[in-house]
């Protein structure tokens, strides 16, 4: 299954809400915006964390420390079981081969191999990272796990 093959589940798509078209439609007069005030006006959006002008919580509390979360690199992952489902003619597996087979996005140059599933044939797999179980399964099947 690929992204362009997805279909909506029955009942997931609703008719659009026609607001301001008379009281009989159920969304007339205030168009579902409640009474008067800032949030009833057009263009109104209050930024997250705004508390009406009082000193917000995120400014009351001290900020300490630093982490690398924003600078992490997320690698696309492929399981050993997915490698087993590749064409029989493929003996060397790289990121380009996986992209051509639709297992990772086109243009991805690095990949991590994880150990879910079984592998029955010898493959020469080149990847940036391997889990320990994936490396063991590839080598047990007679293949090579090469870290790029």
Swiss-Prot record:
One of its GO terms (molecular function) is structural constituent of ribosome. Keywords: Ribonucleoprotein, Ribosomal protein, RNA-binding, rRNA-binding. The keyword Protease does not apply. Signal peptide: none annotated. The keyword Ribonucleoprotein applies. Pfam families: Ribosomal_L27A. One of its GO terms (cellular component) is cytosolic large ribosomal subunit. It comes from the Bacteria. Residues 21-37 have a biased composition (Gly residues). GO terms for biological process: translation. Residues 14-54 are annotated as: Disordered. Part of the 50S ribosomal subunit. Belongs to the universal ribosomal protein uL15 family. PANTHER family: 50S RIBOSOMAL PROTEIN L15, LARGE RIBOSOMAL SUBUNIT PROTEIN UL15M. Binds to the 23S rRNA. This is Large ribosomal subunit protein uL15. It comes from Opitutus terrae (strain DSM 11246 / JCM 15787 / PB90-1). The gene is rplO.
